[in-house]
Amino acid sequence: ATTEIYTLSLQRRSSDLVIQFEIPDEGFILLPSKLYLGVTEEYTETHNFVPFLEGKSSVGRLGIDIHSTAGKGDAGFCNTWTLEISVKQPVRIYSGMPIGQLIYFEISGEINNPYDKKKSAKYNKKTIYPVESMMYKNFK
């Protein structure tokens, strides 16, 4: 699994620098006070659903949070999910380790502006890698 970690303080008005690396077979120890970006192995399309991302309870009991604020997706989001991972204590993770689950809620009615059709959508580019914050695009 590919993971990223921010190397500088976060800047909302510019692209932030991250280090990208593969988790080795022996695992990787996540440390508190760092923000890690991970990515799901699964690609999803949510045309008629609103997806919610939740951590698995066994992972939460290790002190791992898999999302900071982006636990809800948009109808029309078609991509892998970037995970915003932080930990309460040092903990070793492994590639392919099940850490989260998606829950889908069916939409009744018409979707007027699906995410994959929005001109302002910043995270539409299909990828198998974590995607760093694009907050800076809000200030152009």
Sequence positions of predicted segments:
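Glycine-centered flexibility motif
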Residues: 1-2, 63
